[in-house]
Amino acid sequence: MTTNIHAQRILILDFGSQYTQLVARRIREIGVYCELWSWDVEESDIRDFNPDGIILSGGPESVTEANSPRAPQYVFDSGVPVFGVCYGMQTMAEQLGGKVATSTEREFGYAAVQVTGESALFKDLEATQDVWMSHGDKVVEIPSDFVKIAETETCPYAAMANEEKKYYGVQFHPEVTHTKNGLKMLENFVLNVCGCEGLWTSASIIEDAIARIKEQVGDDEVILGLSGGVDSSVVAMLAHRAIGDKLTCVFVDNGLLRLNEAEQVMEMFSEGFGLKIIHVEAEERFLSALSGESDPEAKRKIIGHVFVDIFDEESKKLSNAKWLAQGTIYPDVIESAASKTGKAHVIKSHHNVGGLPDDMEMGLVEPLRELFKDEVRKIGLELGLPYNMLYRHPFPGPGLGVRVLGEVKKEYCDLLRRADAIFIEELHNADLYNKVSQAFTVFLPVRSVGVMGDGRKYDWVVSLRAVETIDFMTAHWAHLPYDFLGKVSNRIINEVGGISRVVYDISGKPPATIEWE
């Protein structure tokens, strides 16, 4: 009998902090299932979810302003432990009778917190804690049934607690790595205060996913779009373990893949792991559908629709294929406003979620839908997939379709593939690949004058992009050595006919996104 890995659960209410997904990932690291919902969730949804504890996230608003977000009153009537982080602490204080004021000194960065009282939150921790602050308001009066449990020189109530009700608030961010013992504080809350156990492990997630797939599809056949990326590869391995040859993988060479990627995918999965794979050559079909289209969102939708059309066609060739397996992961769900509350903001329409037609004829199998990327990678390792494949830099679902700016043409894709391969090869050669979080090349649809030999020529421009990030929510451009960049530029211009200029993108996120489209 499989372990019920969802038996114990934490609910995180999102007030808009850039770190909120990080809170959820930390709870999962502790070994406990959690979900991330919008702050204005209905009371009935919280009742149905039946959490063992609730975390109120940080956020950019000010509690002192009218109509700023508040926690549903049921949070404090439910009888479960509550942990407020930054804005979450402030709204907890305000809603329970305390006072919040705008601080004369905004605290941003490292701070030394002095623990002033015993608390379950700080169990087994020293009296001075290095933490990460990011706030403009502060609690100036705590509710009458709370006690102060920590302070800083400029923040009189850095943490507060009502031990009887199991309510806790901290003005800092325990979820970020800058807070040295932040994970221990979250462990104290989730394991000790809420009484959860570490049921959420890679082994138990695999066991649960296999059981769910078997239960969902029965004796039906399943079709999976295998791209060779992390998500679809892990789904393929899970489904293969669950239903064996009732899984048919469709590998679509859409003309938007990296150099030699098609050959590598077929070799690994068909020959190496023995999966049943149909190889569809569809470059012309995708490029024809994309012809004349330059809008990024429209390109994503077109690519998604053509994929589904191909799967539909291939499934009709199978006697009993009623299910389409997908590599949708939890951040896709959150970002595409397809979360269970439906209140998340659309950032980009992910091909796995927003681009699917309403009249799709197959049911969906999405075994990774509850998982973050780091969890998917850990599962992949346990399933026997190679480290280098699982920890390769992220590649967007629409592939080069969103790395060729504007209209997508075969000529542009071929040039970009070769330029990108040189960039990645040189990163490996210089031992820089694993020191950046993501690196790739972008094709710019503009011609620039160049000099070759005694003549002038007008050829295309590509941009190199490399970023460093912990969570991909924010990112810094990578300060790659000038000599390295010069070498990459020279190789691309000399070896890839048709490119006359190479530039380097030095934009951070924000204001820019990591991908250009």
From Swiss-Prot:
It comes from the Bacteria. It catalyses: XMP + L-glutamine + ATP + H2O = GMP + L-glutamate + AMP + diphosphate + 2 H(+). ATP binds at residues 227-233. Its EC number is 6.3.5.2. The active site is at 86 (nucleophile), 173, 175. Residues 200-392 form the GMPS ATP-PPase domain. It is an enzyme of class 6 (ligase). One of its GO terms (cellular component) is cytosol. It holds the Pfam family GATase. Keywords: ATP-binding, Glutamine amidotransferase, GMP biosynthesis, Ligase, Nucleotide-binding, Purine biosynthesis. Residues 9-199 form the Glutamine amidotransferase type-1 domain. The keyword rRNA-binding does not apply. Pathway: Purine metabolism; GMP biosynthesis; GMP from XMP (L-Gln route): step 1/1. GO terms for molecular function: ATP binding; GMP synthase activity. Catalyzes the synthesis of GMP from XMP. Homodimer. This is GMP synthase [glutamine-hydrolyzing]. It comes from Aliivibrio salmonicida (strain LFI1238). The gene is guaA.
